[in-house]
């Protein structure tokens, strides 16, 4: 469960909309949510937070390092809490479902490729676009 101290630690004032949105992201079954997804979930929970507020708060959370924004091809921005460790993503081209995965071999090979070419890996983002086999 997220705490108000996380907002303060990120340099943000504790407000009811920020708390509600952070709690929604933390408790949601779906880890990657668009601003519209967050808004709909808040409405379904009976929370009175406007869509413009959701967009503004998510942007503030991103700037503060509380969430990570992903702009997967063919879709709008989705957000996930920044508390999870490194992982990569698969995005289903038919449904838009986002699946997280971590593969030590892929991570190792990426570092080798970079090193072989005389570079140091600073960061990376691997997204595989997939479709269920029929």
From Swiss-Prot:
GO molecular function terms attached to this record: DNA-binding transcription factor activity; DNA-binding transcription repressor activity; ferrous iron binding; transcription cis-regulatory region binding; zinc ion binding
Binding residues for Fe cation: 86, 88, 107, 124
Cystine pairs: none
Highest taxon listed in the record's lineage: Bacteria
Region (DNA-binding): 1-83
Gene3D superfamilies: 3.30.1490.190, Winged helix-like DNA-binding domain superfamily/Winged helix DNA-binding domain (1.10.10.10)
Subcellular location: Cytoplasm
One GO biological process term: negative regulation of DNA-templated transcription
List of residues binding Zn(2+): 32, 80, 89, 100
Keyword Metal-binding tagged: yes
One Pfam family cited in the UniProt record for this chain: FUR
Keyword Transcription appears in the UniProt entry: yes
Sections of the chain in a coiled coil: none
Region listing for Dimerization, in residue ranges: 84-134
InterPro entries in the cross-refs: FUR, Fur_C, WH-like_DNA-bd_sf, WH_DNA-bd_sf
Keywords associated with the record: Cytoplasm, DNA-binding, Iron, Metal-binding, Repressor, Transcription, Transcription regulation, Zinc
One GO CC term, this protein: protein-DNA complex
Annotated NCBIfam families: PRK09462.1
Similarity comment: family membership: Belongs to the Fur family.
Stated role: Fur acts as a repressor, employing Fe(2+) as a cofactor to bind the operator of the iron transport operon. Involved in exotoxin A regulation, siderophore regulation and manganese susceptibility.
Subunit structure: Homodimer.
Protein name: Ferric uptake regulation protein
Originating species: Pseudomonas aeruginosa (strain ATCC 15692 / DSM 22644 / CIP 104116 / JCM 14847 / LMG 12228 / 1C / PRS 101 / PAO1)
Lineage: Bacteria, Pseudomonadati, Pseudomonadota, Gammaproteobacteria, Pseudomonadales
């Amino acid at each position: 469960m997220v705490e108000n101290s996380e907002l303060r630690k990120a340099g943000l004032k504790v407000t009811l909309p920020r708390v509600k949105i952070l709690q929604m992201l933390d408790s949601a079954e779906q880890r990657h949510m668009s601003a519209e997804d967050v808004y709909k979930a808040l409405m379904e929970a009976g929370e009175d937070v406007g869509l413009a507020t959701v967009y503004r708060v998510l942007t503030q959370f991103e700037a503060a390092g509380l969430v990570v924004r992903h702009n997967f091809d063919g879709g709008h921005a989705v957000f996930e809490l920044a508390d999870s460790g490194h992982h990569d993503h698969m995005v289903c081209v038919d449904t838009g479902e986002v699946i997280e995965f971590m593969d030590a071999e892929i991570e190792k090979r990426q570092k080798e490729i970079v090193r072989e070419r005389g570079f140091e890996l600073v960061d990376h983002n691997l997204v595989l676009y997939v479709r269920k086999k029929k």
